[in-house]
Amino acid sequence: MRLRGRGPRAAPSSSSGAGDARRLAPPGRNPFVHELRLSALQKAQVAFMTLTLFPIRLLFAAFMMLLAWPFALLASLGPPDKEPEQPLALWRKVVDFLLKAIMRTMWFAGGFHRVAVKGRQALPTEAAILTLAPHSSYFDAIPVTMTMSSIVMKAESRDIPIWGTLIRYIRPVFVSRSDQDSRRKTVEEIKRRAQSNGKWPQIMIFPEGTCTNRTCLITFKPGAFIPGVPVQPVVLRYPNKLDTITWTWQGPGALKILWLTLCQFQNQVEIEFLPVYCPSEEEKRNPALYASNVRRVMAKALGVSVTDYTFEDCQLALAEGQLRLPADTCLLEFARLVRGLGLKPENLEKDLDKYSESARMKRGEKIRLPEFAAYLEVPVSDALEDMFSLFDESGGGEIDLREYVVALSVVCRPSQTLATIQLAFKMYGSPEDGSIDEANLSCILKTALGVSELTVTDLFQAIDQEDKGRITFDDFCGFAEMYPDYAEDYLYPDQTHFDSCAQTPPAPTPNGFCIDFSPENSDFGRKNSCKKAD
């Protein structure tokens, strides 16, 4: 598979929003991966700080949290859904000031000596919702503690000792994963607060729904834009020489990020409040368009590209299995294009056998774009051409359908490595015994990993113990059971990043204040018909 599609393509945009903006090409880096490499001098600094300033900073931060707890407890007494009193009582203003001061002192002790603020924060009557991006770390809580704005959080967070009390003080909107109707209720609550004419605190929302490495802005969830009220975009920057801030699904874990950040002499953060964005009537009717146009405004301010990757792509990148996707995989782009054609991977999985049989019958015969469109039963479109180009490695205008089915199998069931390999053996295997040669194995694994270059000679020879020049699925399966780390040992023996980028997250969501609350049955996405091949 090719690592890039055909490049930038014009995308229509509402005249009321971003104007003649263009959808940029997929980013060169996987937005869900962060690789942190320290020089010898930086390692020496971390070692020195670990023995000196780090424990002091950590203990002081914990002390400040404990100091803030009684004030937050006092101010959070009473029913959480009761409208705040207007104007605020003097004692509440004092508590609010004290909590902001305590939190700012905590961040200062952690090395955030100066927080640069650009622009003006809008009044609640001007913009009830603040949309923050890019979301890259739990340190993004800094603007929350500086403004004491409400946020959207998972309901489990309120039961955490001390932290839960501090959370309740800012009157967040809670989302319960156990309540199937919770997302709809959350959107309704946000809408109610947003239309209260400033009676409620502003709500800060991270519309990306997950953490990225700040190289681009991924798709914004429409939840923050469904109320159809003006929003104020807020962009975050961390202009540090060494990026110890970024906390993505693949990369350093939460504790390591905390340790390395507190071991820096100084950490920088910039918060820029952009002008309030007032939606047009068209955007009020179409929250997805509203979200897209706000994203373009924020991307322009940041100087980064936009991409249609989503939280689901993040899950694909981190799926467990013997073949973990490398950082330069193009399967994320493939998954985006699948959705762009209106094909939902969760609905396609049951038809994979039918797809593979259709591809097997062609015996490797190449097809052109019109035939590919007929195979998928979709019209020829820009998205289809981009997908076609991913498999047209030679640029000759022809592709092998078997590669498409292998890639689709990975996207539909990313954790089931052997199921994908077995499906591939059925398509590539000889009619006599289902065996494949080294060239077939190379094609299968390159497609399954979404890379254009891969050497499989060592792996093939290790499996082919009898030196027959061909292997069966049983041979492969037996070898995989004996050597479950065969990918690292035989495919990437010299690439240390393959291990370091493959960390499994502890929970389905990256943190408590960045969850997706958009209704699952939302009609605000693409409405292409979902057709399947026979």
Swiss-Prot record:
Gene3D superfamilies: EF-hand (1.10.238.10). It comes from the Eukaryota. GO terms for biological process: negative regulation of phosphatidylcholine biosynthetic process; phosphatidylcholine acyl-chain remodeling; phosphatidylcholine biosynthetic process; phospholipid biosynthetic process; positive regulation of protein catabolic process; protein catabolic process; retina development in camera-type eye; surfactant homeostasis. PROSITE patterns: EF_HAND_1, EF_HAND_2. Residues 1-25 are annotated as: Disordered. One of its GO terms (cellular component) is endoplasmic reticulum. Its EC number is 2.3.1.23, 2.3.1.51, 2.3.1.25, 2.3.1.67. Induction: Constitutively expressed. Not induced by inflammatory stimulation. The keyword Endoplasmic reticulum applies. Changing Y169A: Slightly reduced activity. Residues 79-534 are lumenal. It catalyses: a 1-acyl-sn-glycero-3-phosphocholine + an acyl-CoA = a 1,2-diacyl-sn-glycero-3-phosphocholine + CoA; a 1-O-alkyl-sn-glycero-3-phosphocholine + acetyl-CoA = a 1-O-alkyl-2-acetyl-sn-glycero-3-phosphocholine + CoA; a 1-acyl-sn-glycero-3-phosphate + an acyl-CoA = a 1,2-diacyl-sn-glycero-3-phosphate + CoA; a 1-O-(1Z-alkenyl)-sn-glycero-3-phosphocholine + an acyl-CoA = a 1-O-(1Z-alkenyl)-2-acyl-sn-glycero-3-phosphocholine + CoA. A motif (HXXXXD motif) lies at residues 135-140. Changing G209A: Reduced activity. Not activated by inflammatory stimulation. Inhibited by Cu(2+), Fe(2+), Ca(2+) and Mg(2+). Activity is not affected by Co(2+) or Mn(2+). It is a single-pass type II membrane protein. It is found in: Endoplasmic reticulum membrane; Golgi apparatus membrane; Cell membrane; Lipid droplet. It is an enzyme of class 2 (transferase). Exhibits both acyltransferase and acetyltransferase activities. Activity is calcium-independent. Catalyzes the conversion of lysophosphatidylcholine (1-acyl-sn-glycero-3-phosphocholine or LPC) into phosphatidylcholine (1,2-diacyl-sn-glycero-3-phosphocholine or PC). Catalyzes the conversion 1-acyl-sn-glycerol-3-phosphate (lysophosphatidic acid or LPA) into 1,2-diacyl-sn-glycerol-3-phosphate (phosphatidic acid or PA) by incorporating an acyl moiety at the sn-2 position of the glycerol backbone. Belongs to the 1-acyl-sn-glycerol-3-phosphate acyltransferase family. This is Lysophosphatidylcholine acyltransferase 1.
